[in-house]
Amino acid sequence: MIKLNDFIEISNLYNKKYIVLDIETSGVSRINSKVLVVGILNSNGEFVQYAITDKNEEKTLLETISLLLKDKYIITFNGDIFDIPFIKSRMSYHGQKPFIEKSTFDIRKYLIKNKYITDIERFSLKELEIYHDIKRFEEFELDSDVEFYTFDEFKNENFEKVLLHNKYDVINTYYLLDLVNKIEKSKQIHLNDFTIKIDSITHDKNILEINGDISPEIMDYFVEGNNFSLSIVNSSFQLKLYILEGYLETGVLGFVHIHNYPLDFVDESPYNLRKDLIPVFVNRYYLGNIKNIVKTIFKDIIK
């Protein structure tokens, strides 16, 4: 087994210790495939790679990285589905006790969860690198160019290529944290000395539900009107808006919120509707309109 070290110039976006993880394997089977390469980037910029040079070294590799992953906050791209379960399954295969991480953050899962408030349409790492203008200097131009290799193919023909690909996967996963931060900032509402942070927006039939948190803490609160209800418990809020589905213009089907309370903002959608009709969803959420509705309702509570 070999170990490679490097240092990457990064800033600690979260002001806490974390690692960015990516693995390369010989296939998708957790029984018949092996972990070939593990890349780890620490929040202080230290980058380390472990790669097996013999078929029997996987067990040693897993023992080594288990110590690095235990009790850590692990950031991945699709790692909740692939990387972390794969590592743990291979550890169990070798009779090892799988590590227990502190927590995980899967960037791909996060972006899919928030897809209706962004204009992101494709969620492969390569497509997101293009979307967020992240560079990758290696011979693999497309995700499909990276095949699963047998150990002999990996060792004899593609060793350096796979190591480089893994390194860029790790580094560019880190760079996608900047996109995550931009999305999180777009969901914040500042009102007086308070910050209202939207966590999720969903709709079902005639109800648009918005969940989030308020800081600093405020007292519990509940109010219900003709077209909305708001519940605040332990500074977490749930706002339900009554919405209607209809054609906003010829061929454009969407949802609007009908308001009967004063609104002092301009509709950000391109549709010329009555002033009491605020578009909230057409293929994607109109986040600006939704934030303004939230802000208007909270103005009577946070003074």
Positions of PLM-derived features:
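DEDD superfamily 3′-5′ metal-dependent exonuclease/proofreading module
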Residues: 1-33, 42-303
